[in-house]
Amino acid sequence: ATLDKIRDSYITNHPDLNPDFIFAFPAYNVRPNEIGAVIGRSQLKRLDENNKIRRRNLDCFLSRLDPSKYQTDFVVEGSCNYAFTFVLKEPDTALRDRVEQTLRKHCVEFRRGLSGGGNQLRKPYLRKIMGNEFERYPNVNHVHFFGWYIGNYPGLAQGKIESLCQLLNGL
């Protein structure tokens, strides 16, 4: 079978998963250690300032997001988020689809289900072992289907964050 056929098979057999993040086998992230170390060390001198900017960006995002549609009451004290996390307050597949269409239309990179592409218990590699255990976690399942994250970069202009919130709130 070709890679496309294998991928299509996983997508067909797992309609509850985001097709961009179907993990068939347990694995781990492998990154080049030396280059990562050089880049990381070069960024240390800007770490505190970048963290302040990320916190300010997150405050801007959460304060402008419509709390009647999206969860905004996250505990953020002491944290520095690399991403804007947003989750629909209520399950709404039509709104979810409009959110994703709008983000794609405006070339906003996002990941549904938050880090790792959603509820890992739904992924083929764990479902083989755990069966339907995922059903016992309704909050995780809600985030799986109705939550996203968008990168929170220190160079991100406040105006873009405000425009993003206007787009999301207008849906």
Q: What does each model-found stretch correspond to?
A:
Residues 64, 106, 171:
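Short alpha-helical functional segments enriched in proximate histidine and acidic residues
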Residues 159-171:
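C-terminal/domain-terminus segments
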Residues 9-18, 60, 98-138, 142-148:
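Conserved PLP cofactor-binding pocket of PLP-dependent enzymes
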Residues 1-83, 117-118:
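Active-site region of PLP-dependent enzymes
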Residues 81-92, 121-133, 145-159:
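Conserved PLP-binding active-site segment of the aspartate aminotransferase-like
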Residues 58-59, 72, 81-108:
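FAD-dependent oxidoreductase catalytic-site/capping-region signature
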